Regions:
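Gly/charged, well-structured mid-domain segments that form the phosphate/adenylate-handling core
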Residues: 35, 50-52, 83-123
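Active-site beta-alpha connecting loops in nucleotide-dependent enzymes
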Residues: 1-6, 104, 122-204
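A conserved, hydrophobic alpha-helical segment in the catalytic core
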Residues: 25-39, 68-99
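Residue-level signal for inorganic ion chemistry
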Residues: 76, 80, 178, 225
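A glycine-rich beta-strand to alpha-helix segment
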Residues: 208-240
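Glycine/charged-rich beta-loop-alpha catalytic/anionic-binding loops adjacent to active sites
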Residues: 58-66, 111-116
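Glycine-rich phosphate-binding loop signature in dinucleotide/nucleotide-binding domains
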Residues: 87, 138-142, 215-222
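Extended acidic/charged loop-beta regions that coordinate divalent cations
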Residues: 1-63
Length: 240
């Protein structure tokens, strides 16, 4: 898994990690040429709260909060803090900015299909997909899952990356049903069956309109939709 991510960018040797956050992120060093993670100017010093739709955390003594879930979005927030502080913004101004931030355009975008509360999450590579899966795993309620896989140029025509994403985690979640949809619905359905999730609970269709209708008629009151880029755009058009 992610073998490219553990190769030294200077000499292509194998990186060693003192600790690993996720994927290739963490405190690394190459024993061959000495390449290592640069010293940090800003760092997360405490994780106060992490849920599927929000988080609170401390960066160098200052607590911040964002209204979007997942560890990967805390990384995004850390980058925003570093840039804002570099440009001269104080912590209070940064907090105000975070307080106004909301999920947008397929990045944990929320909407209703009938009386079902739905969350749409873009996936496009194994690391991002795995982080999205870990984020939905934090949900404290049952939800249906739809995974929409297209293979247009904007998605990437090679869909083999789905085998490097950690879909196996779905077997630990309260998911009563799964919809496999999109142009490559058979491929993502096969990937989901391999996890050990009950095959009879996986519905497979190329029609995103049918996926929408299935969500509308499901018993579960919550739904997560993980979609590649063009599948996300097509699904959003159906909601207009």
């Amino acid at each position: 898994y992610n073998t490219e991510g553990i190769l030294c960018p200077d000499c292509q040797g194998i990186l060693k990690y003192e600790h690993n956050t996720y994927a290739n992120l963490g405190a690394y060093i190459c024993e061959g040429c000495g390449c290592k993670r640069p010293d940090l100017d800003y760092r997360l010093t405490e994780l106060v709260e992490l849920t599927n739709n929000r988080s609170r955390f401390v960066i160098d003594g200052q607590e911040y909060g964002i209204q979007i879930g997942g560890l990967y979005n805390i990384y995004n927030a850390l980058a925003a803090v570093a840039i804002a502080r570099f440009l001269g913004a104080d912590s209070q101004l940064i907090k105000q900015g975070f307080d106004k931030s909301r999920a947008v355009f397929g990045r944990q975008e929320t909407f209703h299909i009938g009386d079902k509360k739905c969350t749409l999450v873009l996936i496009k590579n194994p690391v991002g997909a795995t982080q999205a899966i870990e984020m939905i795993k934090l949900a404290p309620y049952p939800f249906s899952l739809s995974v929409l896989l297209n293979a247009n140029y904007a998605d990437g025509i090679d869909t083999s990356w789905i085998w490097d994403a950690d879909f196996e985690q779905i077997t630990d979640m309260d998911i009563p049903e799964i919809n496999a949809g999109g142009v490559r619905h058979s491929e993502i359905a096969r990937r989901l069956r391999v996890t050990g999730y009950a095959a009879e609970k996986i519905t497979e269709t190329s029609s995103l309109e049918q996926v929408l209708k299935t969500i509308e008629n499901q018993d579960c009151k919550h739904a997560y939709i993980l979609a590649t880029y063009t599948a996300m755009l097509e699904f959003r058009e159906l909601l207009a």
